[in-house]
Swiss-Prot record:
Pfam families for the chain: Thymidylate_kin
Protein name: Thymidylate kinase
InterPro entries in UniProt: P-loop_NTPase (IPR027417), Thymidylate_kin-like_dom (IPR039430), Thymidylate_kin_CS (IPR018095), Thymidylate_kinase (IPR018094)
Binding-site residues for ATP, renumbered to this chain: 10-17
Superkingdom, natural source: Bacteria
SUPFAM superfamilies hit by this protein: P-loop containing nucleoside triphosphate hydrolases
Catalytic activity: dTMP + ATP = dTDP + ADP
Gene label: tmk
Molecular function, one GO term: ATP binding
HAMAP family assigned to the protein according to its UniProt record, in alphabetical order: Thymidylate_kinase
GO terms classed as biological process: dTDP biosynthetic process; dTTP biosynthetic process; dUDP biosynthetic process
Cystine bridges: none
Keywords: ATP-binding, Kinase, Nucleotide biosynthesis, Nucleotide-binding, Transferase
Length: 213
């Protein structure tokens, strides 16, 4: 079986870190142990600097980051990560487990910011070509639940401080995109933790077994 790229998506507070741990545990039980982990934005020296610029409220002083500048920084970080980390890992037979990928931009910037979706799709195709994750786990949680969890963790970044309306639009776009793409599996992350973990295990196990079929 060739290596695969699995991405975990969701709003702030959806439980992506816990989900990643469950995915890793499940893959190991299935005999898959050669894995690397990525996060977006970030994952390379350049991408981490861009992450700081786009998420750290203090990084640009009083200057307002425009919506299009934000999108372009996300894509600059993403293509650097894809070309220098993700693709080489996959080519070497290593599975890649990612905390966010392009679906985040389509949801946050396309839904939350209201940026033209055709423009975003065109930009994605120009930058990434046909490169896509093999499996995406979208952890669906309401902004009320997710932001309560995120705020309990401590200081919020620039995007985490957006309004409930912003996150409601983002969630709606996530759900819309998930309904259109069979590679995106929606997990109800408002359930008790054990139920969420079981759903992730079942989804990943069944998906890997289908690859072997």
């Amino acid at each position: 079986m060739r290596s695969k790229y699995i991405v975990i998506e969701g709003l702030e507070g959806a439980g992506k870190t816990t989900a990643r741990n469950v995915v890793v545990e499940t893959l190991e039980q299935l005999g898959i142990r050669d894995m690397v982990f990525t996060r977006e934005p970030g994952g390379t020296q350049l991408a981490e600097k861009l992450r700081s610029l786009v998420l750290d409220i203090k990084s640009v002083g009083d200057e307002v980051i425009t919506d299009k500048a934000e999108v372009l920084m996300f894509y600059a970080a993403r293509v650097q990560l894809v070309e220098t980390v993700i693709k080489p890992a996959l080519a070497n037979g290593t599975w890649v487990i990612g905390d966010r990928h392009d679906l985040s931009t389509q949801a946050y910037q396309g839904g939350g910011r209201g940026i033209d979706q055709h423009m975003l799709a065109t930009l994605r195709d120009a930058v990434l070509g046909g490169f896509r994750p093999d499996l995406t786990l979208y952890l669906d949680v309401t902004p009320e639940v997710g932001l309560k969890r995120a705020r309990a963790r401590g200081e919020l970044d620039r995007i985490e401080q957006e309004s409930f309306d912003f996150f409601n639009r983002t969630r709606a776009r996530y759900l819309e995109l998930a309904a259109q793409d069979k590679s995106i599996h929606t997990i109800d992350a408002t359930q008790p933790l054990e139920a969420v973990m079981d759903a992730i295990r079942t989804t990943v196990t069944n998906w890997v077994k289908e690859l072997d079929a």
